[in-house]
Regions:
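C-terminal catalytic "cap/lid" subdomain
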Residues: 1-119
Length: 119
């Protein structure tokens, strides 16, 4: 079976929801969710915390024809929707910095943290 871009993001969210995980970490080629495309816009700012996922946040992932999305961010946001709905937090962080995993698990501000809805 051939994987398509984004399949792993969705699959990991489904598994995290099924096992009632407290935290899902998705690693990417950028530090997290930005208010613009950091590959094209040097003034794009990292969004450290997303309390809830709304149309504005989804548009940052490339939805609604915004053109701001960076490779697979839309699927990461879909994964965030899945897990936050069931009470699991999610973090998007830079996968080229594996030592950050300790900081993420320790609750330090790394990447973009999506807050879980109350169960």
């Amino acid at each position: 079976m051939e994987n398509t871009i984004g399949e792993n993001d969705t699959l990991s969210a489904i598994v995290a929801a099924a096992v009632h995980a407290d935290l899902l970490i998705l690693l990417s080629d950028i530090d997290g969710l930005y208010d613009g495309d950091p590959h094209r816009d040097p003034t794009a700012k990292l969004i450290p915390v997303v309390p809830s996922i709304d149309a504005h946040i989804l548009a940052l992932g490339g939805g609604s024809g915004s053109g701001l999305g960076t490779g697979g961010m839309a699927t990461k946001l879909k994964a965030a929707q899945i897990v936050t709905e069931v009470g699991c937090q999610m973090v998007i962080a830079n996968g080229s910095k594996p030592a950050l995993l300790y900081d993420i698990v320790g609750g330090k501000p790394v990447g973009t943290r999506f807050l879980a809805k109350e169960k």
